[in-house]
A protein has these predicted regions:
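Gly/Gly-Pro- and Ser/Thr-rich, intrinsically disordered tail segments characteristic of DNA damage-repair
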Residues: 1-290, 295-299, 469-533
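DNA-contacting surface of Y-family translesion DNA polymerases
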Residues: 10, 242, 252-437, 452, ...
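Short, charged/polar surface micro-motifs in flexible loops or helix N-caps
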Residues: 14-16, 40-44, 359-363, 447-451
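Short acidic, gly/pro-rich beta-turn/loop elements at beta-sheet edges
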Residues: 19-21, 203, 364-366, 450-452
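Acidic, metal-coordinating catalytic segment for phosphate/diphosphate chemistry
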Residues: 20, 388-533
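Contiguous hydrophobic segments
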Residues: 73-89, 324-332, 339, 435, ...
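Residues at or immediately flanking beta-strands
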Residues: 190-192, 353, 441
Length: 533
């Protein structure tokens, strides 16, 4: 690789959550069949991680648990039939064919056709994964200073290695391998890496080229790209959705322009650049740069970036459909937690946004039509005719359109009471009481730090207003706000010391409440320390 410019390294820990679970069980992460999933959420739950050994059987890295169950059952039927045909299995005392025993190891399964394919289901332990991630980051900082590292996610980093190659007398490949080897020998977890002359090329080298390259004896894969090799190796690569920041929607719009590869995008940018700008607006610039293998952003620029506007949000998918009243309970709980989060992070807001997604089973067909537009639906819970929007879901089934509303406050605040009144007002206004609720999203937007509050506009009083009464009312409001503020801070201190479930409200104990369970989670998944919180 040309040593004249900057050199970046991207590292992605292989099946990180699953690898941690294997290491904790003293199992080989590369040969053990294991998925990380919470079976208490039913078999529809999405697997957070799947080991490479289980992926090799055709199981997706983001499969739902029931898909894993069905695929393994199918594989075992095929294995049993093949073992019987090969004479590896004899009939038992009941005259039936069955496996000798079960194995969770890929090598053992490959060596003995008489073994049943088994797999572990490991409940998520997010706190444990965070500890491993912190330990691995400390290893990276032995080679590269923290200011030259971007933590992209819990299991992925970017590093500007430019100024370390000469001092450590290593090539970029050698430096990346040294970092990965130490992580492997210290934690038992292997990784995939990409080296590139910019951040984009390092990412693509890792995501596309390295993950398709043969692994070494430790399961490590590494690839390098510069602008020239990128064009040689990847301009014809399909599908285009393998590239960073190219989703299915972008791919569909590119196909409409006759672009199916990055090479096609690069060619169109030369022949008819305006077509890309008409289709993608300002985002066309990023797409064109990436098509040519260009990326001007550096680690320093990423570190220095500050978003123009800030927001705090939370969302949850309910385990079962909730009616209007139980949905309102969930919104109250989420609002309480959001207000505490504002206080904790020292933000205030003037605007709240609430989005409610309904359950597909909310509707039944009252009178069939030729399509969704002229079909008459009724609410399945109440039988009332439904007149709202109906949209197809991913499978083409009719689904009620979501409800969305905005609540505005008359002042900057993090007061639970003020925010609660605004959010519940939105809920009561926009949510259809006949429908069943499945997903709730709540956001405080346009946040301002408490120490950066803009000057409030003066309040205009009428000529007939009683100024004394107005001042007394304002004083009472300030006193109530200050009292609530002290209570919020006390709650946060107690939660910090004794756990997030140390202070609860009566509503959290009602049937259907989810705060107690959510307080035991990290990022919406089990922390692994449920008994301690």
């Amino acid at each position: 690789m040309d040593g004249g410019g900057r050199v970046y390294i991207a590292i992605d820990l292989k099946s990180f959550y699953a690898s941690v679970e294997c290491v904790e069980r003293k199992l080989d992460p590369l040969t053990t069949n294991l998925v990380v999933a919470d079976p208490t959420r039913t078999e529809k739950t999405i697997c957070l991680a799947v080991t490479p050994a289980l992926k090799a059987w055709g199981i997706s890295g983001r499969a739902r648990l029931f898909e894993v169950v069905h695929r393994v059952e199918e594989l075992n039927r095929e294995r049993l039939a093949a073992a019987v045909r090969g004479g590896h299995i004899r009939k038992d005392a009941d005259g039936k064919y069955d496996f000798v025993t079960e194995s969770f190891d890929a090598n053992a399964l490959a060596a003995d056709p008489a073994l049943k394919l088994g797999y572990y289901v490991a409940p998520p332990r997010m706190k444990l994964y965070e500890k491993y991630s912190a330990k691995i980051f400390s290893i990276y900082t032995k080679y590269i200073a923290p200011e030259d590292i971007i933590v992209y996610s819990i299991d992925e980093i970017f590093a500007d290695a430019t100024r370390y190659l000469r001092t450590q007398r290593l090539s970029a490949r050698e430096l990346a391998m040294a970092m990965i080897r130490e992580v492997l020998y210290t934690t038992g977890i292997t990784a995939t890496a990409g080296v590139g002359t910019n951040l984009y090329l390092a990412k693509v080298a890792m995501d596309i080229v390295a993950k398709r390259a043969p692994a070494d004896r430790d399961g490590v894969r590494l690839a390098e790209l510069d602008e020239r090799s990128y064009r040689e190796k990847l301009w014809c690569h399909k599908p285009i959705t393998d590239f960073w920041r190219v989703g299915r929607g972008t791919a569909r719009r590119l196909e409409a322009l006759g672009c199916f590869t990055m090479g096609d995008v690069a060619r169109l940018s030369e022949q008819n650049e305006s077509a890309l700008y008409r289709a993608f607006g300002v985002n066309a610039e990023l797409l064109i740069d990436h098509a040519w293998g260009w990326e001007p952003t550096t680690v320093d620029m990423v570190k220095a970036y500050r978003p123009v506007s800030k927001s705090l949000s939370s969302g949850q998918v309910l385990k079962e459909p909730y009616d209007f009243d139980r949905g309102r309970l969930i919104v109250r709980e989420m609002t309480e937690l959001l207000a505490l989060e504002l206080v904790k992070k020292q933000f205030v807001t003037k605007k709240l946004e609430l989005t409610i997604s309904y359950d597909r089973e909310s509707l039944t067909v009252l009178r069939p039509g030729t399509d969704m537009r002229d079909t008459v639906y009724a609410a399945s819970r109440t039988g009332r005719v439904y007149t709202g929007a109906v949209t197809p879901d991913l499978y083409g089934r009719p689904h009620p359109g979501h409800a969305h509303g905005t609540g505005k406050l008359d002042r900057w605040t993090s007061s639970t009471k003020r925010i609660m009144d605004a959010v519940l007002g939105v809920y009561d206004r926009v949510v259809d009481p006949d429908l069943l609720i499945r997903r709730v999203n709540l956001a405080a937007v346009e946040l301002v730090r408490e120490d950066e509050l803009p000057q409030e506009a003066p309040e205009q009083l009428s000529l007939f207003a009683d100024c004394g009464e107005w001042e007394e009312r304002k004083a009472r409001e300030r006193a109530a706000d200050e009292k609530e503020r002290r209570l919020q801070k006390t709650t946060l201190r107690l939660q910090q010391k004794y756990g997030r479930n140390a202070v609860l409200k009566g509503m959290n104990l009602l049937e259907g409440g989810t705060t107690i369970e959510r307080n035991r989670q990290i990022g919406g998944h089990r922390s692994g320390e449920e008994d301690r919180t």
